[in-house]
Amino acid sequence: MDAREIIEMIAKAKKKTPIVAYIKGDLAGIDFSSFKFFGDERFGILFGEYEDFKKLLEEHREKIEDYHLEVKARNSALPLADLTKYKARIEPGAIIRDMVEIGEGAVIMMGAVINVGAVIGEGTMIDMNAVVGGRAIIGKKCHIGAGAVIAGVIEPPSAKPVVIEDEVLVGANAVILEGVTVGKGAVVAAGAVVTKDVPPYTVVAGVPARVIKQIDEKTKEKTKIVDELRNLE
């Protein structure tokens, strides 16, 4: 997605504070039409907006004996993605915004965060606690290591997004800065900070990252993608 489209969408979106409320009391006769309600005349679970619940509480405080409130977000502009639409393995605890593209056979591990407008290619693994920023483009059969950061570029809107081409391995805790392109088959060493484009089939390391060698057979073997981990059967 174009950055200005995302910015306009966020600016115009109705901000939401979604809640889940567990309430106990004399619930007969209370209008729950503003919520999705599950329960009976003594106990109920409400899914809805905080302001609606606040109003309900003020109007019926004498009837509600007790409640527990879970606030899921505050003035949120964008929902999380519907995970059922992806043909991918998405583990518990991954946070994926709406309007993210994820290719078939991709793997999103626990704690990974993927922001709006990002594209994840087929068979790519986003490892634990990695962050993929807004509009970042990651190709097919890549591995983004645990704790790595792929910078997002929604603000400023003129910035070029990160592009990671096919079959790239990004090591744990590496950082790819805004506007960088990592060429096909490249390897970014753990902890590297990549500030400029990486040529295809090279290994970069250090802060800032520099080319230390060309990809050889030994490196290919050490960084090989395991197809069995992408199996969805």
From Swiss-Prot:
Q: What class of enzyme is it?
A: transferase
Describe the reaction catalysed, as an equation.
(S)-2,3,4,5-tetrahydrodipicolinate + acetyl-CoA + H2O = L-2-acetamido-6-oxoheptanedioate + CoA
- In short, the EC number is 2.3.1.89
Keyword annotations: Acyltransferase, Amino-acid biosynthesis, Diaminopimelate biosynthesis, Lysine biosynthesis, Repeat, Transferase
In terms of superkingdom, the source organism counts as Bacteria
Identify the Gene3D superfamilies for this entry. Answer: Hexapeptide repeat proteins, Malonyl-CoA ACP transacylase, ACP-binding
Give the matching PROSITE patterns. HEXAPEP_TRANSFERASES (PS00101)
Say if the entry is tagged with keyword Transferase. yes
> Which GO terms are recorded in the biological process aspect for this UniProt protein?
diaminopimelate biosynthetic process; lysine biosynthetic process via diaminopimelate
Please give one Pfam family short name: DapH_N
Q: Give the pathway.
A: Amino-acid biosynthesis; L-lysine biosynthesis via DAP pathway; LL-2,6-diaminopimelate from (S)-tetrahydrodipicolinate (acetylase route): step 1/3
Q: Which GO terms describe its molecular function?
A: tetrahydrodipicolinate N-acetyltransferase activity
Q: What functional role does this protein have?
A: Catalyzes the transfer of an acetyl group from acetyl-CoA to tetrahydrodipicolinate.
Family affiliation: Belongs to the transferase hexapeptide repeat family. DapH subfamily.
Q: Which PANTHER family match?
A: 2,3,4,5-TETRAHYDROPYRIDINE-2,6-DICARBOXYLATE N-ACETYLTRANSFERASE, ACETYLTRANSFERASE
Name by which UniProt lists this protein: 2,3,4,5-tetrahydropyridine-2,6-dicarboxylate N-acetyltransferase
Upper classification of the organism: Bacteria, Thermotogati, Thermotogota, Thermotogae, Thermotogales
